[in-house]
A protein has these predicted regions:
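Helix-capping and short linker residues that terminate individual alpha-solenoid repeat units
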Residues: 202, 221-222
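Short helix-capping/hinge motifs at transmembrane helix termini and TM-loop junctions
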Residues: 108-109, 160, 184
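Short linear motifs at protein or domain termini
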Residues: 1-109, 225-228
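Conserved amphipathic alpha-helical segments that form helical-bundle/coiled-coil interaction surfaces
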Residues: 113-180, 191-199, 208-218
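Short helix-capping and inter-helix turn/linker motifs at the boundaries of alpha-helical repeat units
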Residues: 18, 142, 187-188
Length: 228
């Protein structure tokens, strides 16, 4: 079943074939990127028009988003975009450190030449976008965050754990929602951190790569907390 309204989102480049999946991805995208602000009441009638989906599809989608933590469901009041808080952000960042650093160590130790090639390509795309951001061109902020996501995913893709990759994706998207709320660029500091992680990973120094990654996430957390 196809839907003419289905469009690729930042974190999901290709349109999906089912209405339910595409509706889930599009609403999640709009929550992450602030089109649906924290605390917004999600009224089914309005969503039906916005996303060209049936009420039954929307209920299923909102329940799935609630199980992933992007939507809150309150008895008698319906669905809301999950509110944000500094404590929640700190918890998400700490969980991301635990999971992503472990996955990175596994990936560095297991990765083959295809993994190396994918990592080089992902870092190249991110590096070019960071140069654009540094020059003052901020017209492609969503593309910048896509390349950031693709780089972090490329780092850990060889961890050989589908479950770990799925859990990491949810944490990364939750963390990204906070970043998009403040949407400030850390500049050379973040770019250098990415290069340090990249260099350590290619050198197959799993412990150094994990340390650099933890520093990177921690610095990003402090930056985002200060901007909230």
């Amino acid at each position: 079943m196809h839907n003419d309204h289905v469009k690729p989102t930042l974190l999901n480049k290709e349109p999906q074939s089912t209405v339910g999946h595409s509706t889930y991805e599009r609403i999640k995208h709009d929550i992450i990127f602030g089109n649906l602000a924290p605390g917004t009441k999600l009224k089914l009638d309005g969503l039906k028009t916005m996303y060209a989906a049936s009420v039954s599809t929307l209920r299923e989608t909102l329940n799935r988003l609630a199980s992933d933590g992007f939507v809150s469901a309150e008895e008698q009041r319906g669905f809301f975009v999950t509110p944000v808080s500094k404590d929640d952000l700190s918890e998400i960042a700490n969980l991301r450190i635990l999971l992503e650093c472990h996955a990175l160590r596994e990936s560095v130790e297991n990765g083959d030449t295809d993994w190396e090639g994918d990592l080089v390509a992902a870092h190249h795309n991110l590096h070019l976008m960071e140069r654009r951001m540094k020059s003052g061109d901020e017209t492609e902020k969503e593309l910048w965050k896509r390349y950031d996501w693709e780089f972090h995913l490329a780092l850990i893709r060889a961890c050989n754990s589908k479950n770990m990759l799925e859990l990491h994706a949810v944490l990364f998207w939750k963390y990204l929602r906070y970043q998009m709320l403040v949407l400030t660029y850390r500049g050379d500091e973040a770019a250098q951190e990415h290069k340090d992680i990249f260099d350590a990973a290619l050198a197959r120094d799993s412990q150094a790569a994990a340390r650099r990654l933890e520093e990177h996430i921690t610095n990003g957390l402090v930056h985002t907390l200060d901007a909230m």
